[in-house]
Structures are given as structure tokens and as C-alpha cells.
């Protein structure tokens, strides 16, 4: 339940990201999974009211290239920032 958002592709991959704006660091992958594990991540996100966003290319890139506990790479900042901004706007309504 620590994630701020879960990005999916929508069924095969899911990645959970945590972002702490005051840390000065990029969002961190705190969980990721394929197939059944992806389903479990999405299910837990819904249980804890964590936003689930479908973005097939981004979910695949993060799943294949970023390990759990690692920050997202600079080339993904813009795409992830757009998703986080959208989630924050939605949650603050």
C-alpha cells in the first residue's frame, strides 16, 4: 500500500511506483510483476485505492529495464511525471 500509482499494460505487466516529492529523487519501482503477479498488484492497488493507469509501452519499458528498489531512469521522467500529475489532480478533487 505504499505505491502512489500502478502502471499496467493492462493484463500482462504491472509496475508500482512510489514518489516522494520532497526527497529530490525520481520515483522508485517498489513492485512489479507479470501475468498472475501483475493481477495481484492491480488487485491490491484497487483494495487500497491506489490509482491504476494503463500505459502499455511505459509499463513494458519499466518492467523490463528497472529493478525493484531502483529509481526510474531520466528518459522516463516526462512520461511518469504526466501520470503522477494526473493522479494527483484526480485525487485532490
Indicate residue ranges for each PLM-predicted region.
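Helical hairpin unit composed of two closely spaced alpha helices linked by a short loop
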Residues: 1-55, 59-60, 64
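Hydrophobic aliphatic residue packing
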Residues: 5-6, 29, 41, 72, ...
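C-terminal terminal-structure detector
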Residues: 46, 60-69, 75-93
